């Protein structure tokens, strides 16, 4: 028996999934109008002339809040399946989850003490 025998449909799906975006992007590039000018390189601001620079720097606090949100969002992602099958897992899985949660809580307390959650 060939070891990859059951993966035929996956390989076909993977090839099609790779070819569709490549063909769509290259096809649209081939049939697009080839016009260039200064208007094409200007930023679009609701049909009026652009005022000022288009480059805006965000404060680092936004990124800190986003990073902390992603961390705890991933925590929820891991805890939901565990909560569904909690009765079947036993005490070992419970202790592992307590260790996981304590590491995350220590990280939250560390970020809090460092002032990452303060907006001043």
From Swiss-Prot:
Enzyme Commission numbers on file: 7.1.1.-
Residue ranges crossing the lipid bilayer per the database entry: 11-31, 65-85, 89-109
Family per record: Belongs to the complex I subunit 3 family.
Topology versus the membrane: Multi-pass membrane protein
Location(s) in or outside the cell: Plastid, Chloroplast thylakoid membrane
Pfam families assigned to the protein according to its UniProt record, in alphabetical order: Oxidored_q4 (PF00507)
Stated name of the protein: NAD(P)H-quinone oxidoreductase subunit 3, chloroplastic
One GO cellular component term: NADH dehydrogenase complex
Subunit structure: NDH is composed of at least 16 different subunits, 5 of which are encoded in the nucleus.
GO biological process: photosynthesis, light reaction
Broad class of where this protein is predominantly found: plastid
Annotated catalysed reactions: a plastoquinone + NADH + (n+1) H(+)(in) = a plastoquinol + NAD(+) + n H(+)(out); a plastoquinone + NADPH + (n+1) H(+)(in) = a plastoquinol + NADP(+) + n H(+)(out)
Organism for this UniProt entry: Mesostigma viride
GO MF terms, alphabetically ordered: NADH dehydrogenase (ubiquinone) activity; quinone binding
Record function comment: NDH shuttles electrons from NAD(P)H:plastoquinone, via FMN and iron-sulfur (Fe-S) centers, to quinones in the photosynthetic chain and possibly in a chloroplast respiratory chain. The immediate electron acceptor for the enzyme in this species is believed to be plastoquinone. Couples the redox reaction to proton translocation, and thus conserves the redox energy in a proton gradient.
First-level EC class: translocase
Keyword list, A-Z: Chloroplast, Membrane, NAD, NADP, Plastid, Plastoquinone, Quinone, Thylakoid, Translocase, Transmembrane, Transmembrane helix, Transport
GN (gene name): ndhC
């Amino acid at each position: 028996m060939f070891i990859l025998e059951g993966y035929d449909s996956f390989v076909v799906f993977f090839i099609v999934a790779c070819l569709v975006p490549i063909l769509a992007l290259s096809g649209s590039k081939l049939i697009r109008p080839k016009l260039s000018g200064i208007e094409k390189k200007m930023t679009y601001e609701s049909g009026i002339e652009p005022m000022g620079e288009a480059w805006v720097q965000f404060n680092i606090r936004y990124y800190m809040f986003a990073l902390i949100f992603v961390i705890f969002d991933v925590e929820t992602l891991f805890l939901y399946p565990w909560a569904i099958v909690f009765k079947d897992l036993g005490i070992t899985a419970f202790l592992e989850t307590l260790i996981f949660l304590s590491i995350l809580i220590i990280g939250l307390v560390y970020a809090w003490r460092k002032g990452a959650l303060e907006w001043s």
